[in-house]
Structure formats: structure tokens, C-alpha cells
Amino acid sequence: MKDAKELKLMTLEDVLSQIENGMTIGIGTGSTIELLIPQIAELIQQKNYTITGVCTSNKTAFLAKELAMNIVDVNDVEKIDLAIDGADEVDSALNLIKGGGGALFREKVIDEMADRFVVVVDESKLVNYLGETFALPVEVDKFNWYQVAKKIERTYDIHVSRRVNEDVPFITDNGNYILDCSLQNRIPAYELHEFLIHLTGVLETGYFLDIADQVIVGTQEGVKILNKET
């Protein structure tokens, strides 16, 4: 049986085939992207492509620059042709939960800018509903994070915890905290997103709703491609 890494590696050929010379691409954050970046760099070198990359995190930018990729700031581009990223959960409508790597705000900015957004996952990320297996990340200001957490818990049957990294609070590239919201039962994603995004102190939620154009899934039986219904 193939492990998660092997399943992700299976999908990368389908991703690379969508990269064309002259593109500006959005590059996500996380374990899947760490596998993909060296292959993008190799593609650029082998085919002598001119590719501009816009990264969703400082970590991704560092990895890409180490491989001599041309990386620019998001404010230096007018458009993004193709965004590529992983996801923590994917439902049947290709809605996502993202933010396990803590880069959800920048990921959403870049993914929404892109003409086409392609997601790469292994089959364990496919769920019946968002929040079924993975806590929803919410990026919040440090100033009132506790009040935001308690407001969420008072309103919904949700357990909220502030994310920590080696016993200290996790800090995003934007200087904020992440609240991980574990749903105790099914809550409609659009409803919960609207509630959360209007709380003072919330920058963004990890719900990526109606954004993905395609999800490439590595399964034990092979690669499965899911396309957004139009």
C-alpha cells in the first residue's frame, strides 16, 4: 500500500503538464508543494521556460529561490495564470479547508487571483463535509484572539484552540495567531464562514469555497481528476 507521500508524487505529472512557458504561477504552502517545487525548477531548466512565481508563504519563497526560481511579490503582478496548492479537506463540490501550514490568508489571496486554481491531494483528504476530520483554521489578530475564540464557542458547538508550535503560539507570516476550530457536528460551511469573517479580529478563515477549478487526487488505484462543474 502506498503512503501519503507516494500518493502525492503520483499526481505531480498532471500538475506539471499544466505549466506553460511565460506563465505567472501561484505556489502554495505545505508538504505537497515541497515535493512539487524541485520538479517545477527542473521543468524550467529542462525546457528553458520563463516562469514567474508568486508564493503564499516565506517558507515557500525560500525553497523556490534556493532552486533559482524567479519569485516576485504579489503586488508586482497584474494576474496569476495558474495557482497550485494542496488542501487539508476536499468535499464533493470541490470546496476546501486549507491552512494546516498557517498560510491561509496569503493562499486565498493568490488562489482567488488565479485564472485557474489546481489542488493536489491524496485520497485521505476527501471528506463527506468540511470539518469532518480536520479542524478549521481561522487567522486572528493577537490583540483579541481570546475574545474571538470564546465568541465562537458560545455560538456554535465548536472546540477552539490557539495553535502552538513547540509550546509557543504559532505566528503567521502576517504576525497573527491561528485558531483551530474543531467542529463537534456538521455545520454548513457558508454559514460558518459568514459568521466568522464578520467577527472583529478575524482576518480570514480556512474555508476555500467555490474557488478550486480542479482537484488531482492520488489514490491506491491511480490518479483521479475532479473538475469543477460549470
UniProtKB/Swiss-Prot annotation:
One of its GO terms (cellular component) is cytosol. Its EC number is 5.3.1.6. It comes from the Bacteria. One of its GO terms (molecular function) is ribose-5-phosphate isomerase activity. Signal peptide: none annotated. It catalyses: aldehydo-D-ribose 5-phosphate = D-ribulose 5-phosphate. GO terms for biological process: D-ribose metabolic process; pentose-phosphate shunt, non-oxidative branch. Keywords: Isomerase. Pathway: Carbohydrate degradation; pentose phosphate pathway; D-ribose 5-phosphate from D-ribulose 5-phosphate (non-oxidative stage): step 1/1. Transmembrane segments: none annotated. The keyword Repressor does not apply. Substrate binds at T29, G30, S31, T32, D85, G86, A87, D88, K98, G99, G100, G101, K125. Pfam families: Rib_5-P_isom_A. The active site is at E107. HAMAP family: Rib_5P_isom_A. PANTHER family: RIBOSE-5-PHOSPHATE ISOMERASE. Catalyzes the reversible conversion of ribose-5-phosphate to ribulose 5-phosphate. Homodimer. Belongs to the ribose 5-phosphate isomerase family. This is Ribose-5-phosphate isomerase A. The gene is rpiA.
